Amino acid sequence: MQYRDLRDFIRELEKRGELKRIQTPVSPILEMTEICDRTLRKGGPALLFEKPTGFDVPVLGNLFGTPKRVALGMGAEDVAELREIGKLLAFLKEPEPPKGLKDAWSKLPIFKKVISMAPKVVKDAPCHEVIEEGEDVDLNRLPIQHCWPGDVAPLITWGLTITKGPNKERQNLGIYRQQVIGRNKVIMRWLSHRGGALDYREWCQKYPDKPYPVCVALGADPATILGAVTPVPDTLSEYAFAGLLRGHRTELIKAVGSDLQVPASAEIVLEGVIHPGETAPEGPYGDHTGYYNEVDTFPVFTVERITRRREPIYHSTYTGRPPDEPAILGVALNEVFVPILQKQFPEITDFYLPPEGCSYRMAVVTMKKQYPGHAKRVMLGVWSFLRQFMYTKFVIVTDDDINARDWNDVIWAITTRMDPKRDTVMIDNTPIDYLDFASPISGLGSKMGLDATHKWPGETSREWGRAIEKDPAVVARVDALWGELGID
């Protein structure tokens, strides 16, 4: 299914019974969070609050509150189909040389499709129907959620931040939360390794006295939103990837006040600059860990202009103890990650990010072990291969007879196949999420790998245990008798 904009997606979800319009006035201060949280935990629909208290702009919440809706947003009918997207990304990340002329011809359509999905720049766009500048810029007119009682201020959560480094051709898309601190100012909370922060750092090195242009798109089409959180190869722009998901090119328009290009179909776009050296303390906010984070300093984004549709929709979410939308996104994107990892490590049979692990902090890997020490190679590979797993604190590796998605299986493997001293890998002073207050230093902490595989000669001097297996003939006999026994 192709969705040209967010409204296309809303219409399709409503047709499928996956979206509920809320006519009752609901406040964006705490109330929307409570309603969305209850709805998400029950696997309920996306919610369109049509009458937010004190505002005339509707609020869209819980949009990606089920894995099914994430899959729909990526152009798939169910989560299982996301493996195919992962296979495409794995190929684009590390394309293999053709094995012959026939193989080369078979791969040609893939490259042609990627090339044909280069973004299309248009001259007119819905996001430019209304332009507010100067004193007319007032973020307080938007129904920006205040999610938790201890939050310091309203927080923009689903803003698609668009940046460009001074030495780069492609633009970067990232989703970074933004604390509102004035009618035209927000704090841009991007971590130092994220694309936006890297672009800004390069700008400051080259132009230390010049303001840095930034745009934030709110309410883009689902493919563009999800393209920003997917492990797209560095050689492929998020806009081009969104085109692949959508089945047609992403339409962009030049920002009014800079050379940045923004999604033409966006509901709202914030245009402005970051003045080098202008920072502010951000937080505290309730976040995906289920705790309030500590206060830290980040750049201030000054909004010089708001462009929007005449009657825009404000897209929002909240983060809290799982399950929340980031955790649900993690469940769905998990299926994209598997083929990418398998391309580099074919011995991996499954990979699972338990949603209780706050989206990415714990990973379970099953593999076909081939030699002593193999499990340790795989766990080190998980930490280093994709940027998304830089902050994964715990990696559990076990054999392919274990179901990575069944805690009963995983715990059994840990408790029967591990010696705590021999099979635990500890790595100190590694990058850790700044929101992880359990680490001894902000942004720097340790990682633990658990080798719960069968041990090979060289890893143990003892005879390894033989798993109990049932007698198939007896199982068949009892199956035949079961109805006569009257047990259930």
Curated annotation (Swiss-Prot):
Pathway: Cofactor biosynthesis; ubiquinone biosynthesis. Mn(2+) binds at N172, E238. It holds the Pfam family UbiD_C. It is found in: Cell membrane. Its EC number is 4.1.1.98. It comes from the Bacteria. The active site is at D287 (proton donor). InterPro entries: UbiD, UbiD-like_C, UbiD-like_N, UbiD_bacteria, UbiD_Rift_dom. Keywords: Cell membrane, Decarboxylase, Flavoprotein, FMN, Lyase, Manganese, Membrane, Metal-binding, Ubiquinone biosynthesis. Homohexamer. This is 3-octaprenyl-4-hydroxybenzoate carboxy-lyase. The gene is ubiD.
